Amino acid sequence: MTAPENDAAVAGFLAGDCRMEEAEEKTEEEADVGAPRLARTKTDAGETGVALDGPAGASTSVALTSQFVAAAGKAKAEVLGAPRLSYRGTEVSFGRAEASDLFALLSTSPEGVSTEGIIDTLWAGNGDRGSRLLESAVRQLNQVMRQASGVGAGVKFVVKVRQRRQLAAAYFDVDLWRFEAAFVRTGTVEGRAARLTALQEMLALYRGPLLDGRDDLWVLPLRRAAQRQAVDAAEQFAELARTEDPDRAVDVLRLAVERVDPHSEVLWCLLMSIQGELGRLPAVRRSFELLKERMAEIDAVPSAQARQVYERLIG
């Protein structure tokens, strides 16, 4: 709590001669707006889960896993966050930049990319050399994966289907593909529990910005699209959970403004609103202070709408 917040809270409580309530609310604030206390749990699938300690000390598990387990016999391709390819726990490295570039591009689409599209995206302006770079990248990627998996020379990990190159789904399990599939399910499944499950899977898979660390121009719109989907997932999850399990909604939103988009006023305003519904006014104040700090990072300030939400809650 900042000094001005502390003075305001103390003055309000003393005016009502409620010293005990002051202590209780301060404890609640520290539990609610501080960094989430994470405890590791094991899921049935062998994944590492995340349990968040609620204000009362009880563990409210939101089962947001830090990683996914690849299907048996498949390489695990993680591109939500820093890109990483592994097979049975061993990291797979590419010998050449063009193979790494091709893998990054193909990992963004299970349907693959046309030959012309690959060359225009990765090696535009190279003329005939672009075609040679593509074939070299395909050979390198196939070779690296054969060595990692121990399969025969006839196995192709990059296949050509109707003039489109794609990662063979039989051999790759890509977190972005799962993320997109879960996104589709959020709009097709019936029932609150099924929607929460799909939204939860999206948030668990989203470790960070798509292909984090790559500054290629072609990545940027795809990165923004994935981030928007994750923000929407957090918002929908919180709205579905706020009535029956508001603490869970708060936990998810706090993780979302850390992991997904620290500058999303939609998430911050929803977080403050639910904190306000729970009567946690110091938490609302702290959330607004954090919002101001995050916006300052990009030389901005909270919008008039965000300030209105805050002022309405504080009264």
Model-found features: residue ranges?
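Short boundary/linker motifs that mark transitions into or out of structured domains
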Residues: 2-99, 156-164
